[in-house]
Amino acid sequence: LVMLGGIEAVWGLRQLYGYAVSNHSLYVLTGSFFNPGPYSGYLAMILPVCLHQWLTKRGEILCSDRNDGKGWKKVMDKVGAMVAGGVMLLILCVLPAGMSRSAWLAAGVSCLCVYAWHMDWTDKFRLLWQQQRQRVVMVVVGGFCVLLLAGYLLFVLKPDSARGRLFMWKITCRAIAEKPLTGYGIHNFAAAYGNAQETYFAAGDYEPWEERVAGSPEYAFNEYLQVAVELGIPLAVCLLVVVVLCLYRGVRKGRYGICGAILSLMIFSFSSYPLQLPVFIVTFGGLLVACLSGADRWQWLGLAVSVGIIGGFRLKNDLQVEQACREWMNARVLYSAGAYQSAEKEYGRLYPLLRDRASFLFEYGHGLHKQQQFGKSNRILKEALLRSCDPMILNVIGKNYQQMGDCLSAEDWFIRSTHRLPGRIYPYYLLAKLYAEPGFRQPDKFEKMKRMVLTKEPKVHSTAIRQMREEIKKIQLIFVHIKKDE
């Protein structure tokens, strides 16, 4: 882990200084990840391991006797301390640039705990409490005030981002309340979240800032809530108890670095999505096993062999999916260029391997919509709804029904889209056009949607919004002429 942390830290420094390219067009710093959030969380997880190694090796060096006949061991301890300390400094150089408040908090708390375990602060605190209780209370109260101030400053750093997380957790809790015992099933978070958010906004009892920060997330940005949504509260509590027991066992065995890494990941999981990435799952599993395993080399060898066998069985399927993703990227070029007929053949061929990916299903369904295969498009897009809460899926399904002449169904889907993300102007525009259809003309509803399109403040002004508003004004003129003729 220390070596991997060093590689990631150097990778990040090279990106910061322009010697390497990041994996995201919007961010300079991503390491080997796709955005700086998980990258910062990974570094924060490794930092307490480095601190533990540095403290341990440094202590062994200070306690060793120069003439104890173990000069080679002392040299290795020095090398280990230098490597751990060097990687720790590299991580500390890169971590602030990631701008991840969750990672900063995770790194700070976990490193403090590792240092406290090494210095045996528990016994010292107990003794101090017996001797100077009043002073301890003052220090604790002061520390609590400092934490509140730090929390406020972290909130002010990115206020809309913080509000967005809070709103996301609020909707997630509403989804949990619908199925608290059984959950919605693995990989069904997005569908559950989308329906819960749709129901919430449809009621109309919400604050303006909630409409502004609402989105269509793939993850809950809180692993505890996400597990509760997918597996139910009882199973989520059981899994948490297992992790806490492993952590307790690790502390009892003196494996402070490993326990610090687990604690860091647990804190980071409160406001991010690390366990949605395979690298975190594998590392987390290894850390938990390391807390329970003894010092016997045969146990570790057996563990390594078991992991290798499981990985071997997974490898074939993973390679097939990876190859399918590469071919999807090639097919996406055809899709983006408007060659929908050629793209459809590729998407149809890749469908069995990539049918669990929402973006793939949306592109496939949208391409079918462009080819006027409306029924087949709806079937694919309704599958995408089980994997995503993106309102654009609802919009395209509604347009399919409109093209098939089922205006009532189209209206229902467009209205669902306005409830799922009321801050978007596009579904109101689609409803306005629907109410202007000759066979479905409804002037009163058109006027209401027209006002929404023309007066609603978008998050970002764009050419598309200007064009929609101009078209609605033209449709309004047609309505005026029709009224005059009548």
Placement of each model-derived feature along the sequence:
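Terminal, low-structured helical/coil segments at or just beyond the last alpha-helical repeat
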Residues: 440-486
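Short coil turns that delineate tetratricopeptide repeat
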Residues: 355-356, 388-389, 422, 458
